[in-house]
Amino acid sequence: MIKKILAVSTLCLIIAPVQAADTYGYLAVWQNPQDENDVLQIKTTKEDSTQNESLAELEAFCKGQDTLAGIGEDQATGCRSVVPLKNTCVALAYPKAGGGVRTGNAVVITSPRFTSVHQIALNQCIKKYGAQGQCSLETVYCTSSAYYSGTVSSLIQHLK
């Protein structure tokens, strides 16, 4: 019994630092507010970022896109669709038959499981638009680079 208690206590001590290393990110969709037919710009922030780092990267992207499009600082930004993320993965799927990604046809799914988040997004897109929609993935992203190799591998990497 004491061995079991020690084993559980040791495991809790090992896992606690892993859970403390939160990672943040954003999935942003920028659409030119002056021309809704303009191509969408999709941005994910870099992996393994703190909350402040990912927010700074998002703000730089939005401001840069606005500047390129000639949008003044007193006007509304084109970054209207922003998904904040913490310790998770995200996938964006869309119906290719509809002519491309639009803010109205994007299917966005979040999940801590990289291995399945893309399939869930595709399945939801197909459910919504049918096989004739020819659903496709636009992006799959995780806030932590360790998530790409799976949950068990992530835990092992953090323990090293």
Language-model segments: residues:
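Secreted/extracellular ectodomain signature
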Residues: 21-160
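Sec-dependent N-terminal signal peptides
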Residues: 2-16
